[in-house]
A protein has these predicted regions:
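Contiguous, glycine/small-aliphatic-enriched amphipathic segments in soluble metabolic enzymes
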Residues: 1-142, 185-209, 213-251
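A generic structural signal for well-ordered coil/turn residues at beta-strand boundaries
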Residues: 73, 154, 163-165
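Conserved beta-strand scaffold positions in the cores of enzyme catalytic domains, especially
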Residues: 76-79, 157, 166
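FAD-binding core/adjacent interface of flavoenzyme oxidoreductases
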Residues: 147-160
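Ligand-binding beta-strand-loop-alpha-helix segment within the catalytic cores
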Residues: 159-189
Protein backbone atom coordinates (compact mmCIF):
# COMPACT_ATOMS: atom_id res chain seq x y z
CA UNK A 1 0.00 0.00 0.00
CA UNK A 2 1.36 3.41 -1.00
CA UNK A 3 2.26 5.80 1.79
CA UNK A 4 -0.10 8.68 2.41
CA UNK A 5 1.20 11.95 0.96
CA UNK A 6 2.89 14.44 3.28
CA UNK A 7 1.10 17.78 3.05
CA UNK A 8 2.91 20.93 4.16
CA UNK A 9 0.44 23.52 5.46
CA UNK A 10 1.59 27.09 6.06
CA UNK A 11 0.19 28.70 9.19
CA UNK A 12 -0.48 31.98 7.39
CA UNK A 13 -0.15 35.40 8.99
CA UNK A 14 0.31 34.90 12.75
CA UNK A 15 -2.04 37.84 13.36
CA UNK A 16 -4.78 36.15 11.36
CA UNK A 17 -6.93 33.07 11.81
CA UNK A 18 -4.72 30.55 10.01
CA UNK A 19 -3.56 28.90 13.21
CA UNK A 20 -7.14 28.42 14.43
CA UNK A 21 -8.28 27.12 11.04
CA UNK A 22 -5.39 24.66 11.08
CA UNK A 23 -6.27 23.38 14.55
CA UNK A 24 -9.93 22.96 13.61
CA UNK A 25 -9.04 21.17 10.36
CA UNK A 26 -6.60 18.80 12.01
CA UNK A 27 -9.07 18.03 14.80
CA UNK A 28 -10.89 15.97 12.15
CA UNK A 29 -9.56 12.41 12.15
CA UNK A 30 -10.54 11.86 8.51
CA UNK A 31 -7.71 14.17 7.46
CA UNK A 32 -5.18 11.70 8.85
CA UNK A 33 -6.87 8.85 7.02
CA UNK A 34 -6.01 10.52 3.72
CA UNK A 35 -2.69 12.28 4.28
CA UNK A 36 0.15 13.14 6.66
CA UNK A 37 -0.16 16.85 7.49
CA UNK A 38 2.52 19.09 8.95
CA UNK A 39 2.14 22.79 9.78
CA UNK A 40 4.90 25.17 8.69
CA UNK A 41 4.74 27.97 11.23
CA UNK A 42 5.38 28.80 14.87
CA UNK A 43 4.62 26.22 17.56
CA UNK A 44 3.86 28.94 20.13
CA UNK A 45 1.16 30.42 17.89
CA UNK A 46 -0.34 26.99 17.37
CA UNK A 47 -0.34 26.37 21.14
CA UNK A 48 -2.15 29.68 21.60
CA UNK A 49 -4.77 28.68 19.02
CA UNK A 50 -5.34 25.34 20.76
CA UNK A 51 -6.01 27.17 24.04
CA UNK A 52 -8.32 29.73 22.41
CA UNK A 53 -10.37 26.91 20.92
CA UNK A 54 -10.45 25.04 24.22
CA UNK A 55 -8.90 21.91 22.75
CA UNK A 56 -6.03 21.40 25.22
CA UNK A 57 -7.38 17.98 26.17
CA UNK A 58 -7.80 16.88 22.56
CA UNK A 59 -4.86 18.35 20.65
CA UNK A 60 -1.15 18.43 21.45
CA UNK A 61 1.45 20.43 19.53
CA UNK A 62 4.60 18.58 18.51
CA UNK A 63 7.36 20.99 17.46
CA UNK A 64 9.94 19.64 15.01
CA UNK A 65 12.95 20.98 13.14
CA UNK A 66 12.85 18.35 10.40
CA UNK A 67 9.97 16.70 8.55
CA UNK A 68 11.49 13.33 9.49
CA UNK A 69 10.75 14.10 13.16
CA UNK A 70 6.99 14.35 12.55
CA UNK A 71 4.84 11.54 13.94
CA UNK A 72 1.67 12.17 11.87
CA UNK A 73 -0.79 10.91 14.47
CA UNK A 74 -4.31 12.17 15.01
CA UNK A 75 -4.49 14.16 18.24
CA UNK A 76 -1.01 15.54 17.73
CA UNK A 77 -0.29 18.40 15.33
CA UNK A 78 3.24 18.35 13.97
CA UNK A 79 4.63 21.86 13.55
CA UNK A 80 7.80 22.64 11.64
CA UNK A 81 8.73 25.32 14.15
CA UNK A 82 10.21 28.42 12.50
CA UNK A 83 10.39 30.37 15.79
CA UNK A 84 9.82 33.73 14.11
CA UNK A 85 7.14 35.25 16.33
CA UNK A 86 7.83 37.09 19.58
CA UNK A 87 4.72 36.15 21.56
CA UNK A 88 5.16 39.23 23.78
CA UNK A 89 4.49 41.36 20.69
CA UNK A 90 1.92 39.06 19.10
CA UNK A 91 -1.54 40.54 18.65
CA UNK A 92 -4.40 39.16 16.55
CA UNK A 93 -5.80 41.52 13.93
CA UNK A 94 -2.78 43.84 13.94
CA UNK A 95 -0.78 44.28 10.73
CA UNK A 96 2.92 44.17 11.54
CA UNK A 97 6.32 43.74 9.97
CA UNK A 98 7.06 40.83 12.33
CA UNK A 99 3.99 38.86 11.27
CA UNK A 100 4.52 39.74 7.62
CA UNK A 101 8.07 38.43 7.75
CA UNK A 102 6.95 35.25 9.49
CA UNK A 103 4.12 34.59 7.03
CA UNK A 104 6.46 35.12 4.09
CA UNK A 105 9.13 32.80 5.48
CA UNK A 106 6.55 30.06 6.08
CA UNK A 107 5.69 30.15 2.38
CA UNK A 108 9.33 30.16 1.31
CA UNK A 109 10.03 27.19 3.59
CA UNK A 110 7.07 25.12 2.35
CA UNK A 111 8.17 25.73 -1.24
CA UNK A 112 11.72 24.69 -0.34
CA UNK A 113 10.51 21.50 1.34
CA UNK A 114 8.39 20.64 -1.69
CA UNK A 115 11.22 21.32 -4.14
CA UNK A 116 13.46 19.03 -2.09
CA UNK A 117 10.77 16.31 -2.15
CA UNK A 118 10.51 16.33 1.65
CA UNK A 119 6.77 16.95 1.30
CA UNK A 120 4.41 15.92 -1.50
CA UNK A 121 2.11 18.93 -1.72
CA UNK A 122 1.53 22.34 -0.19
CA UNK A 123 -1.51 24.08 1.28
CA UNK A 124 -1.50 27.72 2.36
CA UNK A 125 -3.42 29.67 4.96
CA UNK A 126 -4.06 33.35 4.31
CA UNK A 127 -1.32 35.96 4.31
CA UNK A 128 -1.69 39.72 4.65
CA UNK A 129 -0.24 41.36 1.53
CA UNK A 130 0.20 44.64 3.39
CA UNK A 131 2.22 42.91 6.11
CA UNK A 132 4.58 41.01 3.80
CA UNK A 133 5.24 44.20 1.85
CA UNK A 134 5.82 46.03 5.14
CA UNK A 135 8.48 43.40 5.81
CA UNK A 136 10.18 44.25 2.51
CA UNK A 137 8.86 41.41 0.35
CA UNK A 138 7.12 43.04 -2.59
CA UNK A 139 4.68 40.43 -3.84
CA UNK A 140 0.96 40.71 -4.47
CA UNK A 141 0.15 37.20 -3.26
CA UNK A 142 1.00 33.51 -2.96
CA UNK A 143 0.93 32.93 -6.71
CA UNK A 144 3.74 35.38 -7.36
CA UNK A 145 5.85 34.06 -4.47
CA UNK A 146 5.49 30.49 -5.73
CA UNK A 147 6.38 31.55 -9.27
CA UNK A 148 9.49 33.41 -8.13
CA UNK A 149 10.83 30.71 -5.82
CA UNK A 150 10.19 27.92 -8.34
CA UNK A 151 11.74 29.98 -11.16
CA UNK A 152 8.53 29.88 -13.18
CA UNK A 153 8.09 32.52 -15.88
CA UNK A 154 4.68 31.59 -17.26
CA UNK A 155 2.01 31.08 -14.63
CA UNK A 156 -1.46 31.97 -13.43
CA UNK A 157 -3.80 31.10 -10.58
CA UNK A 158 -6.27 28.22 -10.87
CA UNK A 159 -9.30 27.83 -8.62
CA UNK A 160 -10.71 24.30 -8.58
CA UNK A 161 -13.96 22.79 -7.35
CA UNK A 162 -15.43 19.46 -8.42
CA UNK A 163 -15.72 19.61 -12.24
CA UNK A 164 -15.07 23.35 -12.59
CA UNK A 165 -11.67 24.99 -12.79
CA UNK A 166 -11.15 28.72 -13.25
CA UNK A 167 -7.92 30.28 -14.49
CA UNK A 168 -7.29 34.02 -14.20
CA UNK A 169 -5.77 36.28 -16.84
CA UNK A 170 -4.85 38.66 -14.00
CA UNK A 171 -4.87 38.31 -10.20
CA UNK A 172 -4.16 40.94 -7.57
CA UNK A 173 -4.36 44.16 -9.57
CA UNK A 174 -6.87 47.00 -9.72
CA UNK A 175 -9.93 46.65 -11.94
CA UNK A 176 -8.45 49.25 -14.27
CA UNK A 177 -5.23 47.26 -14.62
CA UNK A 178 -7.14 43.99 -15.01
CA UNK A 179 -8.92 45.37 -18.08
CA UNK A 180 -5.63 46.61 -19.51
CA UNK A 181 -4.12 43.14 -19.12
CA UNK A 182 -6.63 41.53 -21.49
CA UNK A 183 -4.24 41.14 -24.42
CA UNK A 184 -4.11 38.38 -27.01
CA UNK A 185 -0.77 36.91 -25.91
CA UNK A 186 -1.74 36.80 -22.24
CA UNK A 187 -5.15 35.26 -22.96
CA UNK A 188 -3.51 32.65 -25.22
CA UNK A 189 -0.90 31.92 -22.57
CA UNK A 190 -3.63 31.33 -19.97
CA UNK A 191 -5.58 29.06 -22.31
CA UNK A 192 -2.45 26.97 -22.84
CA UNK A 193 -1.68 26.86 -19.12
CA UNK A 194 -5.27 25.84 -18.31
CA UNK A 195 -5.21 23.08 -20.92
CA UNK A 196 -1.86 21.71 -19.76
CA UNK A 197 -2.78 21.96 -16.08
CA UNK A 198 -6.01 20.02 -16.59
CA UNK A 199 -4.09 17.27 -18.36
CA UNK A 200 -1.51 17.23 -15.57
CA UNK A 201 -4.20 16.52 -12.98
CA UNK A 202 -5.74 13.71 -15.00
CA UNK A 203 -8.30 15.35 -17.29
CA UNK A 204 -7.45 13.70 -20.59
CA UNK A 205 -9.57 15.88 -22.87
CA UNK A 206 -10.07 19.31 -21.29
CA UNK A 207 -12.86 21.53 -22.54
CA UNK A 208 -11.88 25.18 -22.26
CA UNK A 209 -14.36 28.04 -22.01
CA UNK A 210 -13.02 31.57 -22.45
CA UNK A 211 -14.82 34.42 -20.71
CA UNK A 212 -15.48 37.73 -22.37
CA UNK A 213 -14.58 41.03 -20.73
CA UNK A 214 -17.42 43.38 -21.61
CA UNK A 215 -21.21 43.20 -21.13
CA UNK A 216 -22.66 40.63 -23.55
CA UNK A 217 -19.09 39.97 -24.74
CA UNK A 218 -19.04 43.41 -26.32
CA UNK A 219 -22.12 42.86 -28.53
CA UNK A 220 -19.99 42.95 -31.70
CA UNK A 221 -18.15 46.08 -30.61
CA UNK A 222 -21.05 48.08 -29.17
CA UNK A 223 -19.80 47.75 -25.58
CA UNK A 224 -16.08 47.28 -26.13
CA UNK A 225 -13.71 45.75 -28.65
CA UNK A 226 -11.50 43.52 -26.48
CA UNK A 227 -13.43 40.41 -27.52
CA UNK A 228 -12.84 41.23 -31.21
CA UNK A 229 -9.27 42.50 -31.03
CA UNK A 230 -7.72 40.40 -28.25
CA UNK A 231 -9.79 37.45 -27.02
CA UNK A 232 -11.12 35.97 -30.28
CA UNK A 233 -7.67 35.96 -31.95
CA UNK A 234 -6.29 34.13 -28.90
CA UNK A 235 -9.09 31.56 -29.13
CA UNK A 236 -8.49 31.07 -32.85
CA UNK A 237 -4.78 30.42 -32.35
CA UNK A 238 -5.42 28.06 -29.45
CA UNK A 239 -7.84 26.01 -31.54
CA UNK A 240 -5.28 25.87 -34.35
CA UNK A 241 -2.95 24.28 -31.79
CA UNK A 242 -5.56 21.60 -31.12
CA UNK A 243 -6.94 22.97 -27.84
CA UNK A 244 -10.61 22.11 -27.42
CA UNK A 245 -12.71 25.27 -27.02
CA UNK A 246 -16.26 24.03 -27.78
CA UNK A 247 -17.91 27.47 -27.98
CA UNK A 248 -15.19 28.73 -30.36
CA UNK A 249 -15.75 32.26 -29.04
CA UNK A 250 -15.75 34.21 -25.76
CA UNK A 251 -18.79 33.48 -23.63
Amino acid sequence: MAKKPIIGITMGDPAGNGSEISVKALADSSVYERCRPIIIGDANCMEKAVKILGKENEIKIHAVQDVKEAIFEFGTIDVYDMKLVDMKKHMYGKVSKMCGEAAFQYVVKVIDLAMKNEIDATVTNAICKEAINMAGHHYSGHTEIYADYTHTNKYTMMLAHDDLRVVHVSTHVSLRQACDKVKKERVLECIRIANNACKAIGIQEPKIGVAGLNPHCGENGMFGVEEIEEIQPAINEAMEEGINIPEKKPT
